[in-house]
Regions:
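Hydrophobic alpha-helical segments, especially transmembrane helices
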Residues: 186-189, 205
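Alpha-helical bundle regulatory/interaction domains
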Residues: 1-184, 194-199, 213-218, 222-233, ...
């Protein structure tokens, strides 16, 4: 297994969390359910020019091997190849709009080919990475491409950043709107444009993320206590939210985790998850 991480300098340092090369950590090809996340990422498959996702019925959908994975509002099913090698970019929350532009809200729950966003530069990116002499060189190429795609016309919105921090801590959307002096519809418009999710959906996804991080490493849970700790009305409310966002019951989640808190073996009762894209 090989993992190389590059932390870009200014002006990307506040926009890109990391550029990462990974290879050889997948022992066999498998399909995994991925929990919803507000993060937006860029992925380039170095094994083949394709990524694959699956719907509830098992039908697969392919997308080009260089793509933007938008924020997700529900669980999705993705194939991970044996010996998978890829380059990925993790954007700081709200920063992907500087690279995806006004297309970011349309990328929600989608895998978007980079050619669609960047034209020829996106279409040729995978080939350029494969031509790099070393993985470290490939990461340098990726940083250079990001610099060229960076647009200065979409400044990060301080109100959106403040709202995201408050919502991530568990504040309500109405409370955040009042504290920022914004009408709810104004906050919704500005927040969705830069994050890709509405404030309400973002808050629900972040609450689920706080919950699963709290559960990480535990085989059992006191669900009533977890509901109270993470802002659910009661245990049934927690269970309903879990099924709606993750497609499994809380108990099924504990039994099906693989590779960290956000990856599950497909199956279980309830919606099986939707295809990303």
């Amino acid at each position: 297994m090989a993992v190389i991480v590059r932390r870009p300098g200014p002006p990307l340092s506040g926009l890109v969390t990391a550029i990462v090369y990974r290879a050889g950590e997948q022992p066999q090809t498998s399909v995994e359910k991925i929990l919803p996340s507000p993060e937006t990422g860029l992925w380039v498959n170095l094994n083949r020019d394709e990524f694959r996702s699956f719907d509830q019925a098992g039908a697969s959908r392919g997308v080009a091997g260089a793509m933007l994975a938008g924020p997700t509002s529900r669980a999705c099913l993705i194939e991970f190849e044996q010996g998978h090698a890829h380059v990925s970019v993790t954007f700081a929350l709200g920063a992907a709009s500087r690279f995806a532009g006004p297309s970011l809200p349309e990328a929600r729950d989608e895998l978007v080919p980079l050619e669609t966003l960047w034209g020829r530069s996106g279409a040729c990116l995978r080939e350029r990475l494969l031509e790099a002499a070393t993985p470290a060189d490939a990461l340098e190429v990726m940083e250079t491409v990001l610099l060229r795609q960076l647009t200065g016309t979409l400044a990060l919105d301080p109100a959106v950043a403040a709202a995201a921090r408050a919502l991530s801590r568990g504040a309500g959307v109405g409370e955040v709107s009042r504290d920022l002096g914004l009408l709810p519809r104004t906050l919704r418009r500005r927040f969705t444009a830069q994050v890709g999710l509405t404030p309400k959906r973002f808050a629900r996804v972040q609450r689920l993320q706080r919950l699963v991080r709290d559960l990480d490493g535990h085989a059992r849970a006191d669900w009533a206590a977890m509901a109270a700790r993470h802002g659910y009305a009661d245990q049934p409310h927690l269970a309903d939210e879990f099924r709606d966002l993750a497609g499994v019951t809380p108990g099924e989640y504990l039994r099906s985790r693989v590779n960290g808190p956000n990856h599950l073996r497909p199956g279980g009762a309830g919606p099986a998850g939707a295809a990303c894209g």
